[in-house]
Amino acid sequence: MSRNGFAGTTKLLRLILRLDRIKLTLWLLGLITLIGITPYSMRAILDAEAELQGTTAEEVLAQQAALLETNGASIALQGPPDALDTFGGRYAFEIGAFTLAIVALMNILLIARHTRAEEESGRAELVRAAAVGPWSALTAVSIVAVATNLILGLGTSIVFIADGRDVGRSILYGASMALSGLLFAAIALIWVQVFEYGRAATGMSLAGLAVAFALRAVGDVRDNWLSLLSPLG
């Protein structure tokens, strides 16, 4: 082991990217595709419903908003009923909380896989026997997490801007996606330092995600401050 606490970080970073290049690519492509396809599918559904009713998509959106604003189950599962009579507000309601939960899961699994899971498999011990510092592994996986979330946030913003959404709001939404992912990556990094086994660290991180979802659900249904405590709020 090197005396330099961060020695070998670059090599470990390249190793993580080589091992996870397919997984991370699939995660990012899947999320960005979901984010990009949803507006088009929503618009098609609204247009079809408007054609059946002989009205406009805006009127259908307003009708559905009136129903959803009083539906506690939908609010608990999907998020606050803000601006549901607008296309952007309806999109955030339909997929916002769900997407953030997936982003959180991606980050939790990434951190656990390259920390405690590596130690349990014995690969971490082999790496540490070389000229690698004690903080190199955590630093390398943290860099990967930051880069992954930045790419996701940027991709999300680009998709929204390409769809004709407001540039400022698109950037804000992409930033919120990236920051939520980084928060759960940080939570996972804390738990892998507390617990010896990867499953325990992953379990506690997922428990944190469940608590965040529950706080958001209760806060949104009751329209109170609890949702402000949740990174999914």
What are these model-derived regions, one by one?
Residues 90-117, 149, 156:
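Long, hydrophobic alpha-helical segments
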Residues 42-80, 211-233:
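Terminal transmembrane helical anchor/hairpin motif
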Residues 1-32, 197:
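Aromatic- and glycine-rich beta-strand/loop motifs that create alpha-glucan
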Residues 6-19, 79-89, 128-129, 133:
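Cytosolic juxtamembrane amphipathic/interface segments immediately preceding
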